[in-house]
UniProtKB/Swiss-Prot annotation:
Residues annotated with Phosphoserine modification: S392
Listed Polar residues bias regions: 364-374, 541-554
UniProt-listed Gene3D superfamilies: N-(1-d-carboxylethyl)-l-norvaline Dehydrogenase, domain 2, NAD(P)-binding Rossmann-like Domain
Residues where Phosphothreonine is found: T343
Span list, region Disordered: 339-374, 422-451, 495-574
Compartments (UniProt record): Cytoplasm
Annotated protein name in UniProt: Meiotically up-regulated gene 72 protein
Function: Has a role in meiosis.
Amino acid sequence: MSEEDTSKLRILSVGSNAISAFISWRLSESKACHTTLIWRNRCESVLSEGIRIRSSVFGSTKWKPDVVAPTVEQLAMNSEPFDYIFVCLKILPSVYNLDTAIKEVVTPGHTCIVLNTTGIVGAEKELQHAFPNNPVLSFVLPDQFAQRGPLQFEHTTFAADSAKSVIYVGLTEEEDDVPDSVQDAMIETLTLTLEAGGVSCDFLSKIQKKQWETGVGHMCFYPLSIINDEPNLALMYRLKSFAKVIDGLMDEAFSIAQAQGCEFEPEKLDVLKRHIVNRMLATPRPSYPYQDYIAHRPLEVAVLLGYPVEIAKELGVSVPRMETLLALFDAKNKRNLTVRAGTPQSSPNFNPAMRRSPVGAASRSPSRSTIGISNRIGSVDDLLNTRQFTSSPIGGSMPKGPNSIYKIPSASMVNLSSPLVTSPSGLNPTGRPSRFGGRVRGNPLTMNKAGSVSDLLSTSTNMASSDALETASMIGVPSAMPPNSFDMLTLTQRRNRRNNQSSSPPAPSDRRYTMGARRPVQTRGMTDSVIPILEDPMSTLYDTSRYPTRNSKPATPKASRPPSIASTVHRRMD
């Protein structure tokens, strides 16, 4: 190591996430730090290619740390101690102890430990008990981070002045074993170094208030989102029942904060609650806890609800809602870990047989063909639950809540190869769900977003009731079709078929007349009935029959477009 490096502050950042990379990047930009980054996966890529960061404050860059290591154990043999260790790890007491993760690189009486407590309350006690001779600081970074790809992160600031990023550094409680002079020197040095890196650093003697401001939204929204399998926080908060529960949880959280010594002005508390709700509803979805839930990884139960409930018990604050939610959240986490990773959890009322299309049908199952396309889906489970595909009981109907977004089923959610069901019970013999037969939005004469021809033709009053044989031509059922049955062809295919009824049948290689690239079954002595097409009344204005052809005389025009102003002026001039 050169003399220049020995004069720099030795910084170690532990954590393979955006906050860890952002802090190390800004400290290295101060030109006063030698940065070491612990990156568990893709360690060689970080060292060779770097990390791409796009910031709304500092612009876009590709940054490489001075040293990269996959584990802390590889740095234990270093002769030079670290001055600051930024701990940006997930806090999972049921999986590992936070102090053991950094124990080998902490020098007693020298290293200052800086813990990321953004949205976390009460996590510093473990480090303070494990390292009594080392100062333990906490920092809160309210900015928003999002991962856009492998080793690619985006940073957006929420400060009042969007041209700067603010980080709050402070103490939770005074440490008796650390001299005040040493503690003040470490805080001042860190503050000046962050300022040199372009980050505004505010020191707070009591940082719990900022921790509660950033953590109340997490502990009120994320557990409910996971328990209800709903990643869309805005959709969940739109329901009055959930909004009432969330408001009650926020009241209990702020009562704990006030009992802990954090002062909130009563007239500004409602404004703060609205700000927290709006910020949570604006977060990208799915949230990071929900991503862990989908991947069957351990959830931060202690961070979101465990530590706040412990503080409430110590202070004698009654929090029945948080205690109930903690019990449900912990049970959900344990059940999620027992499920093998990669195995989807089906809804208890969902029958996988309902997803199958009729035998020989060409279209895919709607649960696979519409994921990520329809904007009417709140989550994957919404696509598979009873609101979409579970058939209603005999003689009954499927209940819908007053605030349900599925009041009007979308035509895009219908399996085009499934036959319509007209039985009184609403079910066909195979128990498949019936297609939506209600009203179709829009003008039926200009409908261009219908899910199928049957959806468009269902608006006709002279339409005969169809049955399960209406798709016989496509799925290969031979001739025994009633007169009212028809093929599920598009409007253009029906028009071509009607005009070419007297012509010879298509060649075997001709695939234009079938929806699923299959020729219709040719019948002898019988012609399938064709339902009249709903012609567009506006098409007569632009009829091309008035133009002359090679072997015929020009027909009398029925109607034409009105002459333009320019043509009228030229005629007058002539």
